[in-house]
Amino acid sequence: MTIKAPTLNVPGLGVDPLTQRIKEKEKKWKYKIAVLSGKGGVGKSTVAVNLTAALAKMGYFVGILDADIHGPNVAKMFGIGNTDIYAEKFEDGHFEMIPPTVDFMGQVTPIKVMSMGMMVPEDQPIIWRGSLVTKAIKQLLGDVMWGELDFMIIDFPPGTGDEILTVVQSIQLDAAIVVTTPQEVALLDTGKAVNMMKKMEVPYIAVIENMSYLICPHCGNKIDIFGEGGGEKLAEKEGVDFLGKVPIDLKAREASDLGIPIVLYGDTPAAKAFMEIAEKLVNKLKEIKGDGREK
């Protein structure tokens, strides 16, 4: 005869408090979106920052977590340098950090930003082993006062390493946006990132092609510097959505130096592309979740 085994009450086998806090917090985040790339140098963080700003410009409450512990630059791209981070102490003795917010003089709904780049000097490297990186990411998820969010954007480091596994095992992602450029070497690694998200059973996966083309400032002709159509072909091959192309924008460097997302820096081709991509993403996620409500 087979009987049900009794429940064991062994100290240390329960859910640790940090994991429990993460689970409680993610209930308040309507959509959790990862932004990743198979390789570096494709403008992944630029996409994450501008997607965040575009959603906030549409009136949504958005938070962005920089999960690139060794190369954090999200804060700088939002105009936030090394700064004091304040925290609140709770009754059980744990502390939660208060994330800085930016609204660019009221242009957007206040964006909550958290990055290791705020906590260490710009020229100081973070030399941590995997276990410390894992703990840091979990703390940025669970020990920050994120509050209610329509969108939680998580900017992953390039590749398919531990940081991604930590996040995917900690929260249930709603979408993964994989960033590529038209170059063959980028497309090869992008395919690996797409397949990783498939194995992680992320419900919605899409590709964005960054640095897709350049509009000549003199003649207005379109120049395909890195090739043409690679991102769209990859998305079709992998059976995932293609959200759009973002052109090389000469004003992007100027905006970046000022700590302003290009989507908030005038009516430029890249700004238009990011707004269109954000609208497509919102509509797709509402369709998947059966939520037709407007913000």
Curated annotation (Swiss-Prot):
Q: What is this protein called?
A: Iron-sulfur cluster carrier protein
Q: Which InterPro entries match?
A: Mrp-like_CS, Mrp/NBP35_ATP-bd, NUBPL-like, P-loop_NTPase, YlxH/NBP35
Q: Which GO terms describe its biological process?
A: iron-sulfur cluster assembly
Keywords annotated in UniProt: ATP-binding, Hydrolase, Iron, Iron-sulfur, Metal-binding, Nucleotide-binding
Binding-site positions, ATP = G38, K39, G40, G41, V42, G43, K44, S45
Its job = Binds and transfers iron-sulfur (Fe-S) clusters to target apoproteins. Can hydrolyze ATP.
- How does the annotation summarize its subunit structure? Homodimer.
Among CDD domains, the record links this protein to: Mrp_NBP35
Q: Which GO terms describe its molecular function?
A: 4 iron, 4 sulfur cluster binding; ATP binding; ATP hydrolysis activity; ATP-dependent FeS chaperone activity; metal ion binding
